[in-house]
């Protein structure tokens, strides 16, 4: 929910989007589409969240739903990659990643989600979260592909 304005954040997200596109094709996954939904204009927070949830669920359809919310789990990059691999192997190649608006997410989204991911308890701007999601998707795909981008577990001491 929300739009990413032009600038360095949009450029960073676009760079990762292009990388993800190439990896998706190589791994037999659906490509990456970015859908920006406007924030609801409802007066009450609960009404805004409910309207936004309805629009997001309609867009997600039958896709795997990954919701990014502070109430979620904080999986390792390897665990996130394994979930994506499992979904692909189950024939579920479409993954919808949802980042909420400034009012947060309606509980219906978390209930419907196949995975709720948290980047921690910190509050972050939407554009930063979008860049983190794009990078983690790329990282997960490189882990699945055995690409050297991800170098976890190395001790430089």
Residue map of PLM features:
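N-terminal beta1-alpha1 ligand-phosphate binding loop
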Residues: 1-24
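Short glycine-rich anion-binding loops that position phosphate/pyrophosphate groups of nucleotides
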Residues: 3-4, 70-73, 101-104
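Short, surface-exposed alpha-helical segments at coil->helix boundaries
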Residues: 10-18, 50-54, 107-110
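Conserved strand-to-helix beginnings and helix N-cap segments that scaffold or border functional pockets
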Residues: 10-13, 77-81, 110, 130
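Catalytic-core regions built around general acid/base machinery
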Residues: 16-19, 83-90, 112
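S-adenosyl-L-methionine/SAH cofactor-binding core of RNA-modifying enzymes
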Residues: 25-95
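Structured adenosyl-cofactor binding patch, chiefly the S-adenosyl-L-methionine
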Residues: 103, 107-156
């Amino acid at each position: 929910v929300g739009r990413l304005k032009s600038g360095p954040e949009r450029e960073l997200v676009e760079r990762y989007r292009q990388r993800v596109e190439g990896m998706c094709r190589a791994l037999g996954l659906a490509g990456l589409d970015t859908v920006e939904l406007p924030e609801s204009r409802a007066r009450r927070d609960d009404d805004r969240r409910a309207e936004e949830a309805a629009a997001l669920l309609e867009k997600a359809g039958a896709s795997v739903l990954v919701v990014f919310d502070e109430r979620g789990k904080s999986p390792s990059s390897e665990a996130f990659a394994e979930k994506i691999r499992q979904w692909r192997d189950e024939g579920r190649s479409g993954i919808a990643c949802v980042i909420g608006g400034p009012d947060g997410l309606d509980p219906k989204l978390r209930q419907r989600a196949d995975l709720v991911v948290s980047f921690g308890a910190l509050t972050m701007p939407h554009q930063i979260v979008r860049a983190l999601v794009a990078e983690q998707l790329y990282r997960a795909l490189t882990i699945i592909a055995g690409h050297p981008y991800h170098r976890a577990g190395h001790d430089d001491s």
